[in-house]
Design a protein with these regions (language model features):
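Short acidic active-site motifs
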Residues: 51-53, 102-103, 270-274, 312, ...
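Glycine-rich beta-alpha loop elements in corrinoid/cobalamin-binding modules
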Residues: 32-155, 357-364
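Radical SAM enzyme core and accessory elements
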Residues: 2-5, 40, 53, 62, ...
Length: 456
């Protein structure tokens, strides 16, 4: 069969980090790897080229598979609609994060099958059935229109599949992670045992770590053509012994790459010597979720770290000469004094890069119930659920004042914390220009949000 795998274009009105962190569609690369031997298959990344109609006309796929993030629902449905308009015989499949979290959002006249989770087995079973045109029985993880979207109800999660990165060869020079461009991504471990209250990732991947064999990891690293790799494990720094073995293998194989990873404060402070060694083995930056200056909020979020731990982690990274790309969460109960305390806290931590998002109670999270009465978004306003919009009504200041405080914080980060000089020193002037273009787009979005609230 001919299969076209599609990543939808960016949702324009969403405020996301996409301008700074633009990763390969690795889920589609995994599907490609499973199906490539028996089918003719290609990937269309609509974030780079918006050529769906041309592909439908020239490639003439029998199946179009569309991946999704939480904010993509309407975009996926509109792609499905366009596909069926052009050729109603094309089979349309939806999958991705949103399908796992909110399956029924894809129950749509133009979508034939929805993958709640993807495994080698369910991919092969479905495509065998589609090819043979035999009656479609229920398959684990797949909800088909012909079966009224029923499935076997067997619980499952996405299987770890080694992606075929050649499938995105023509796009790869575009993928970047902040100043590292081109940059590949890979996963060396699934799940997370930290179980933070606000986090979707461990709920999607599992409540404890499932580490991939390091030989398999090393083989992938050797195969990756890019000089920079972002490990998108939930907490790459979790296991000291595994990290030491990782460093051994990097040294034995003379691998010289730039690595970026997510790492928890708890892991950084529990094995500082290993963190230093990782720095010598190529670890350039760690994305750390410090979240807040408030001890109470850290406890409420069920973070396993304290404010003091945050300072310790920051010091360890600086001593190891590893950049810290910090992320924070803005609590809806903050007032202007809290924002001021927050700015002082960030100034003391002095991360090289600072990102933030307002606390977002996604419908699948327990905290959704807690904030249900203060929600500013409806569940079906899918595009609005981007991490940067205020979704909970602030309790102590007005919404427009809250947006004003966010704007003040953005200016504080850019003008006072010298992010610009870090960018130039680390990545050069052209990267600063590229990133600044993204920031410039974000600033008016917040100004617009603030003014909209004032008018209403
Ligand atoms: S450490 Fe990170 S990935 Fe793990 S549960 Fe907490 S926020 Fe989620």
């Amino acid at each position: 069969m001919k299969i076209l795998l599609v990543r939808p274009p960016r949702v324009k009105q969403a405020v996301t980090l996409g301008e700074f962190m633009f990763c390969e569609p690795i889920g589609l690369e995994m599907v490609y790897a499973v199906l490539m031997d028996r089918h003719e298959i290609k990937i269309l990344d609509m974030m780079i080229e918006n050529t769906l109609e041309k592909e439908l006309e020239t490639f003439k796929p029998h199946v179009v598979g569309i991946t999704s993030l939480c904010i993509d629902v309407n975009m996926v449905k509109s792609i499905a609609c366009k596909v069926k308009e052009i050729n109603s015989g094309i089979i349309v499949i939806a999958g991705g994060t949103q399908a796992f979290l909110n399956l029924s959002s894809f129950y749509d006249i133009n979508i034939d099958h929805v993958f709640k989770y993807t495994t080698r087995d369910n991919l092969n079973l479905l495509f065998d059935a589609l090819e043979s045109k035999k009656e479609l029985h229920l398959i684990d993880g797949i909800h088909s229109k012909v079966n009224q979207y029923r499935s076997t109800n067997v619980f499952g999660r996405n299987e770890y599949i080694i992606p075929n990165r050649l499938s995105t060869q023509k796009y790869r020079q575009h993928y970047s992670y902040l100043g590292y461009k081109p940059c590949a991504i890979m996963q060396t471990s699934l799940g997370c045992s930290s179980n933070c209250d606000f986090c979707l990732r461990w709920r999607i991947e599992g409540a404890k770590e499932n580490d991939i064999d390091l030989e398999c990891v090393m083989n992938q690293i050797k195969d990756i053509q890019e000089d920079s790799i972002m490990f998108y494990d939930n907490n790459f720094l979790n296991n000291r012994d595994r990290l030491e073995k990782f460093c051994d293998l990097i040294e034995q194989n003379n691998i010289v790459k730039n690595f970026i990873c997510y790492g928890s404060v708890k892991s950084i402070i529990s094995h500082p010597e290993t963190i230093k060694r990782l720095g010598k083995c190529g670890l350039k930056a760690v994305l750390v979720g410090y979240e807040t200056f408030s001890e109470k909020e850290l406890a409420d979020y069920k973070k396993k770290s304290t404010v003091e731990d945050n300072y310790k982690a920051s010091k360890i990274l600086k001593e190891a000469k590893i950049d810290c790309w910090a992320s924070f969460m803005l609590h809806p109960d903050w007032d202007t004094k809290d924002f001021k305390n927050f700015r002082s806290f960030v100034k003391k931590l002095k991360p090289e890069i600072t990102t933030f998002c307002p606390l977002t109670p996604f419908p699948n999270l327990p905290m959704y119930q807690k904030y249900k009465d203060r929600l500013l978004l409806r569940i079906e306003d899918y595009e609005m659920w981007s991490f940067s919009k205020v979704s909970i009504k602030p309790s102590k200041i007005s919404l427009s004042r809250y947006y004003f405080e966010i704007l003040k914080f953005i200016l504080f980060v850019n003008l006072r914390l010298n992010s610009a000089s870090y960018m130039i020193n680390r990545f050069g002037f052209m990267t600063l220009i590229r990133i600044t273009k993204g920031s410039i787009k974000i600033l008016p979005l917040y100004i617009k949000l603030m003014l909209e609230v004032r008018k209403s």
